[in-house]
UniProtKB/Swiss-Prot annotation:
GO terms for cellular component: cytoplasm; nucleus; precatalytic spliceosome; Prp19 complex; RES complex; spliceosomal complex; U2 snRNP. It is found in: Cytoplasm; Nucleus. It comes from Saccharomyces cerevisiae (strain ATCC 204508 / S288c) (Baker's yeast). Its main location: cytoplasm. Required for pre-mRNA splicing and spliceosome assembly. As part of the pre-mRNA retention and splicing (RES) complex, required for nuclear pre-mRNA retention and efficient splicing. Required for MER1-activated splicing. InterPro entries: Nucleotide-bd_a/b_plait_sf, RBD_domain_sf, RNA_proc/Spliceosome_comp, RRM_dom, RRM_Ist3-like. This is U2 snRNP component IST3. The lineage of its organism: Eukaryota, Fungi, Dikarya, Ascomycota, Saccharomycotina.
Length: 148
């Protein structure tokens, strides 16, 4: 049994049912979680797919080697709603993906200023993808409206 499950069980046995009394409350002002023991073949997209089950992710930072660009096996993910972090920590800690048991926990992560260029590049690419997707959908709809 992992530590997080033990803490949750202890809270239940003690009758702690209020979110304000829970150990999760310490992280109430931070919507980031730490994701460790990742299979190094997983991408940001894979992480978003899995973790979107518990809320809307708004940021994911997959740690990569500066020289090779290869994953270092851990990431930070931010949810739109901090309460989603509780669901992810409680439900995905120990969950196996790619043959590895994930280590999920709350964190006080703060993005580094040096990542600003990275964020801007990712946002630019996502914006292009959204525009491309919207344009593709418009083209498909326009094509459907045309007579054969």
């Amino acid at each position: 049994m992992n530590k997080i499950q033990q803490i949750n069980d202890k809270e239940l046995q003690s009758g702690i049912l209020s979110p304000h009394q829970s150990w999760h409350n310490e992280y109430k002002d931070n919507a980031y979680i730490y994701i460790g023991n990742l299979n190094r073949e997983l991408t940001e997209g894979d992480i978003l797919t899995v973790f979107s089950e518990y809320g809307v992710p708004v940021d994911v930072i997959l740690s990569r080697d500066e020289n090779t660009g290869e994953s270092q096996g851990f990431a930070y993910l931010k949810y739109e709603d901090q309460r989603s972090t509780i669901l992810a920590v409680d439900n995905l800690n120990g969950f196996k993906i790619g043959g590895r048991a994930l280590k999920i926990d709350h964190t006080f992560y703060r993005p580094k200023r040096s990542l600003q260029k990275y964020y801007e590049a990712v946002k630019e690419e996502l914006d292009r993808d959204i525009v491309s997707k919207n344009n593709a959908e418009k083209l498909i709809l326009a094509k459907k409206d045309q007579p054969n």
